[in-house]
Amino acid sequence: MKNLLFITWDGPQTSYMEGLFMPIFQEIAKTSDVKFHVLQFTWADENKISETKSAADKMGITYSALSILRKPNVSVGSLLTVLTSSNKIKNYIQENNIDVVMPRSTFPAMIVNKIKNRHFKIIFDADGLPIEERIDFSGLQKDSFQYKLMKSAETKMLKNADAVITRSQKAIGVHINNIGNENRNKFSVVFNGRDKNLFKLNSNSRVEARKELGLENEFLFVYAGSLGTQYCFPEMLEIFKNHTKANNSKFLILTGNTEFAEQKIPNELKSSVILKSVKSDEVPYYLNAGDAAFALRQPSFSMQGVAPIKLGEYLLCGLPVIASKGIGDTGDILKNFEECYLYDHSIGLQSQSKLIINFLEKAIFADKSRIADKAKDYFSLEAAADSYIKILNII
């Protein structure tokens, strides 16, 4: 049996660990002789940590949390945590006979880089293009000490790791440009998977959810996820507004940030928009009420490395999707989904409004079961697990 240690660095507001990674690890363990350990660096409170540990226990995963210092300020506290954690990780590796270490993203990579005389294999989860994402959305400057420190650590890990996993082929291209083509063979793309028994086409859920929402024959747009400047809320509202001019339509928004949505929705659309904040396991129920979904995101440089989780959730539920061009490998994947529309941000909405109207007219007749079946090849837990297993088998 291989003992694999996954090291991650997460804020308290994220649920990637219990919602994405641990279900994939559980699925891998069903068919592979691998025991998963998780060390999560976090500043979450005891309740959140307890919830995550409980989820891990149920999935047969050994979970521990390590605190991230937040004083004297966030940046210095994070650096101090990195500088003082390598011995803790080294001890854990020795005490638990760890064979493979999988650091996810920059800070865990920095910690593992500091371990000398290693006797374990490394699979580096490069996690998209996280440093470039900080440049695009958090104001990180390329000439700053922080950027140079993180980029140096990432480059060292990319070169030293036995294998590197990304979420897109485009991300591999970016990394190869950085470290050289001789390292290409160590790179692989892994999928983000969802439980196809939860995210699935369900006619009963559709009837019940539409009744609960007070819908009859209305065409229902749906969006599930975060809201903010990078998630193209104005474009969603404009597409919806255009559709209401000639159709009886509503827009269901499932988000934890309902306050943001309330502030941005124009008065003339408020009566046609339904805002809800629901638990993650309730999302598929409401998605089944929909007729088309939005998966829009600003296609900045860093977004080449992203695999949109929501896109998979929509497609597994059989929904036609309006998705952004230039986000990870979305364009290549959606070549197999003629029931979806690739939104080109470079030409703006007005230039493609007629194409979108035509797409939406056809969407109501889409074969949802066919969409859901095709989606399993890319977005199911089984597909995600298989993509990891291929790497574990050759490491």
Where are these regions (language model features)?
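Membrane-proximal helix-turn-helix segments that form the acceptor-binding/catalytic region
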Residues: S86-N91, M110-K114, F124, P130-I131, ...
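A charged, aromatic-enriched C-terminal amphipathic alpha-helix characteristic of glycosyltransferases
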Residues: D344-S351, E361-N393
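N-terminal subdomain of nucleotide-sugar transferases
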Residues: M1-K53, D57-M59, N96, E238-A246
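Nucleotide-activated donor-binding/catalytic signature segment of Leloir-type glycosyltransferases, i.e.
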Residues: T255, A261-Y285, A292
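Carbohydrate-associated surface elements
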Residues: K170, G193
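Nucleotide-sugar-dependent
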Residues: Y231, S277, D281-Y286, A293-E313, ...
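A short helix/loop element that forms part of the nucleotide-sugar donor recognition site in Leloir-type
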Residues: E51-A55, K200-G214
